[in-house]
């Protein structure tokens, strides 16, 4: 079994005062983190290298008016690849969990490639998810979510390498047919 990195989830009111508290975290600025904004109905998942600045930006965004709380997921071992991957996984799983309606317009910046200690971050994600259940930000365990139809067919789901290659081939062939005027093979 891969190593599990220790994480902490710090929660604050989604307000100017809460943003100031984020600023004073040891990793509130200049450190990669993942965060969740939530109200009673909606949530937003993001990642940033400056939580204080990013929360400030969200406070000015009218789309986030219904948010009441910010949860910052911190880890000493976090790096940009890991936070992008965790963000992507959170969006996929929270969408399928259905506790909140996500305001995310996409699945985050997917990490298709391998990165250092990726298996350890997958184990770490499982621990993060358990903490989110304890905090009321998630309801179902990962096994139940990953076996649900909504997760399997989610629009947030990352394509497999084989699926990605098929999409690229289809786009290439369609482009070629359009450029040559061969409408029969579109």
Where are these regions (language model features)?
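Generic detector of well-ordered alpha-helical segments enriched in charged/polar residues
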Residues: 23, 52, 56, 87, ...
């Amino acid at each position: 079994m891969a190593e599990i990195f220790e994480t902490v989830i710090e929660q604050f009111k989604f307000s100017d005062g809460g943003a100031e508290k984020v600023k004073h975290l040891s990793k509130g600025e200049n450190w990669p983190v993942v965060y969740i904004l939530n109200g009673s109905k909606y949530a937003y998942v993001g990642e940033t290298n400056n939580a204080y600045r990013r929360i400030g930006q969200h406070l000015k965004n009218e789309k986030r008016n219904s948010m009441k709380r910010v949860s910052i997921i911190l880890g000493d071992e976090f790096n940009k690849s890991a936070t992008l991957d965790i963000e992507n996984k959170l969006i996929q799983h929270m969408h399928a969990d259905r506790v909140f309606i996500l305001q995310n317009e996409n699945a985050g910046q997917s990490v298709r490639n391998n990165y250092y200690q990726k298996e350890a971050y997958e184990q770490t994600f499982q621990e993060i998810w358990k903490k989110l259940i304890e905090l009321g930000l998630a309801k179902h365990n990962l096994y139940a979510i990953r076996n649900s139809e909504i997760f399997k067919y989610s629009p947030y789901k990352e394509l497999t390498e084989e699926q990605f290659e098929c999409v690229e081939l289809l786009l290439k062939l369609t482009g070629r047919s359009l450029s040559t005027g061969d409408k029969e093979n579109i």
